[in-house]
């Protein structure tokens, strides 16, 4: 009896609202990958973002694949929103091999005031 198991690589990523974030996915094969998204690990519904190496039309505005290097199918999310937080899974289209799981956390922007004044006093006796 043959049992196939996939290697699972789990990565945590953090991004700030409005930034661009890259979620890594590498495969030694030239087989296209599927990317799916779950809002949480216990979610009952998954959204397909990419099927057979093509971004699904609903997501093409902000999501791209980094396919400039053979084997690199990293997902790039532009203008990250809080709604993008969740679990992203990349796996080879044939269903064997490595599965990449990326847990994305999104933080709000931090604003820093530029009107800070520092005064130094010299005390002499």
Model-derived segments and spans:
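N-terminal V-set
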Residues: 27-62
């Amino acid at each position: 009896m043959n049992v196939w198991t996939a290697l699972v690589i789990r990565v945590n990523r953090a991004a700030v609202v409005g930034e661009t974030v890259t979620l890594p996915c590498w495969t030694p094969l030239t087989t296209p990958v599927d990317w799916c998204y779950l809002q949480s690990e216990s979610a009952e519904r998954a959204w397909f973002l990419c099927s057979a190496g093509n971004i699904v039309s609903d997501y093409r505005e902000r999501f791209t694949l980094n396919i400039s290097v053979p084997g690199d199918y990293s997902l790039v999310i532009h203008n990250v929103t809080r709604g993008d937080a969740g679990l992203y899974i990349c796996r080879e289209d044939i269903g064997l091999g490595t599965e990449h799981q990326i847990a994305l956390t999104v933080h709000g922007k931090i604003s820093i005031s530029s009107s800070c004044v520092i005064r130094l006093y010299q005390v002499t006796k």
